[in-house]
Amino acid sequence: MMARSATRRLERPCDERAGAGRPATTRHWVPIVVGVVAWLAVWQIVAMAVGQEIVVASPLRVAQVLGHLVASGSFWVTAARTAGHIVAGFLLAVALGTALAWVASLHRWVAALLSPPIRLTRLVPVVSFIILLLIWGGSAWLATTVSCLMVLPAVFDSISEGLARVPSELREMARVFRVPRWRTLTAITAPALWPYLIAACRVGVGLAWKAGVSAEVIGLPAGTIGERLSMAKLYLATGDLFAWTAVIVALGIATERLALWLLGRAERRFEGVGL
């Protein structure tokens, strides 16, 4: 059936598919562009009204600083180092949170054992973790560890909820017919978990970047975005502060888009798996 539907899709004229998709894409992007331009205009008006770059740097000044940063060789090394640490922490949290939620769904005593530390991690301020980790191990992997700790509870809670909502009759059917565990995972469990995993990733990416950069600002590991933000604060370079903030936002959006794209590809691969 999937092969026939794929064949029917291929038989449609290319110009028909392109024409059908173009208006939807335009409708999607036009409000976003208008909103961005409107807020940039508000920002420019506020900067002109204040009249002090040290308080509010204008968008033009930030764009100029950003251009100088991008042209320098150290910018890419700095951005890559911070992104690598934060993405590593995010991926570790997704893997660890998913595994712990899976084990907790199978054994009640594991769920009871994990509940206090998960809840504690969710409630303790991120700055407390940062200071403790600095005392215990320095700043080399601080951003990775803090990002992982902040994202882990969100992933654990979301995956736990998804596992609890997997249809029990399907799992019982798989058990009765002695379906292999890997087949049960790919055909029953994984499809039910995709919405929860996607939701966890949407929330987790933002948490990872906020926590990771905060850790760098406090820990000051050399050659990181957090160190550059701290230097901008020290020298009251508001333009640099805004420019590096724009870089963080852009990297966060890129990370989220990449994660969702990879999840989408994985979901499509599981769509054709049956019992």
Name each model feature, range by range.
Residues 1-37, 257-275:
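Transmembrane alpha-helical segments of polytopic membrane transport and secretion proteins
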Residues 21-22, 48-91:
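Periplasmic/extracellular loop-to-transmembrane helix junction in inner-membrane transport proteins
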Residues 88-118:
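Transmembrane-helix boundary motif in ABC transporter permease subunits
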Residues 108, 164, 195, 199, ...:
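C-terminal transmembrane helix and the adjacent membrane-cytosol boundary/short C-terminal tail
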Residues 119-154, 161-162:
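Generic hydrophobic transmembrane alpha-helix motif, especially the helices
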Residues 135, 210-248, 270-275:
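Glycine-rich helix-loop "coupling/hinge" segments at transmembrane-helix boundaries
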Residues 145-149, 181-215, 243, 255, ...:
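Transmembrane alpha-helices
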Residues 158-200, 229:
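Short cytoplasmic-facing helical segments at TM-TM junctions of multi-pass membrane proteins
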